[in-house]
A protein has these predicted regions:
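Sec-dependent signal peptide recognition
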Residues: 2-7
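C-terminal motif of bacterial Sec signal peptides marking the signal peptidase cleavage site
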Residues: 13-16
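A sequence/structural signal for flexible, mid-protein segments enriched
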Residues: 18-298
């Protein structure tokens, strides 16, 4: 009898763990998602899609037949032209991508805004000020060590930061007729390390793209040293310093934090709100201007 009582109690405990909860999830109201990064060396363009709910099984689809008005300093320049391209997705299904183009390059210092309307969605608006390119000065390139086919270099460069809030992206490109990409580099520069979210002393930034602000050197000449390794290949190496808008800087940082958060177990990390400057929608309208310097490696 005693054993039967224990068995009955344990059976009830396990049975009570199987609970089905019906969640009353409100239907997701789709909004326009706009992604557009203006660069002074390319014509104005944007991709437009729509949002999906967290529990929505449907895929993200690009939106066609939208009216996209482009303004420069508040003056209407005209409407974007819609272009469609077809490709096959990972399920071997024919998919279409709609891109909106405007045949004009943006100008540094100008404010560009979009007003976008579509009969199925709430109208959205966004604007960005295109930053001016900052001249890059390479002070020296030093060969630190050489072993077999590997060479360790250090490049020291500088630029003059304007006395206002500025945001930068640093990349190091390699290329020849067969290869084209961005090389990893490392630096112990405090601005890069702080902007990457690392606060510990003695830390080193490592990656192929550094985003940083001018909080530590506003309005002064800034000098940075980076280390990198090259191998015995006939490649050209170019240092690339890009002035980016605050909207682009904030969006990319929040997007990285969102992706990093996905690597954790469910509910283990704090949710990350991805930045947007699209009124009544999602996505980003950002801008940038770039200066480059071809390196002569000793």
């Amino acid at each position: 009898m005693k054993n039967f009582l224990y068995f009955f109690i344990f059976s009830m405990l396990f049975a009570s763990c199987d609970i089905v909860v019906d969640l009353d999830i409100p239907e997701h109201e789709r909004v326009l998602v706009v992604n557009s990064i203006l660069t002074t060396d390319s014509m104005i363009n944007a991709s437009i899609s729509h949002s999906v709910g967290a529990f929505d099984a449907s895929s993200i689809s690009y939106v066609n037949n939208a009216t996209v008005e482009v303004y420069e300093d508040g003056v209407l320049l005209g409407e974007m032209n819609e272009e469609v391209s077809f490709s096959y997705n990972y399920m071997d299904e024919l998919d279409s991508t709609y891109v909106y183009n405007f045949n004009q390059n943006p100008v540094a210092g100008k404010i560009y805004s979009y007003e976008i309307a579509h009969p199925d969605y709430e109208a959205v608006r966004a604007e960005t000020t295109v930053p001016a390119a900052v001249k890059l000065n390479v002070n020296d390139v030093t060969l630190l060590s050489e072993q077999d086919d590997e060479k360790h270099y250090r490049v020291r460069f500088s630029f003059n930061d304007a006395p206002e809030d500025n945001f930068y992206r640093l990349r190091f490109r390699y290329q020849n007729e067969y290869y084209d990409g961005f090389n990893d580099f490392e630096s112990n520069d405090a601005s890069m390390i702080s902007s990457a979210g690392v606060q510990s002393d003695g830390a080193t930034f490592y990656g192929d793209e550094a985003l940083f602000d001018d909080e530590m050197f506003n309005g002064t000449e800034k000098e940075i040293s980076i280390d990198f390794f090259v191998y015995n290949k006939p490649l050209e190496y170019t240092l690339e310093l890009t002035s980016v808008s605050e909207s682009y800087y904030t969006y990319i940082r929040s997007l990285r934090a969102h992706y990093d958060n996905q690597d954790q177990f469910i509910f283990a990390g704090e949710p990350v709100q991805v930045f947007t400057n699209i009124e009544n929608g999602l996505g980003v309208l950002g801008s940038m201007s770039v200066d480059t310097m071809l390196l002569e490696l000793p």
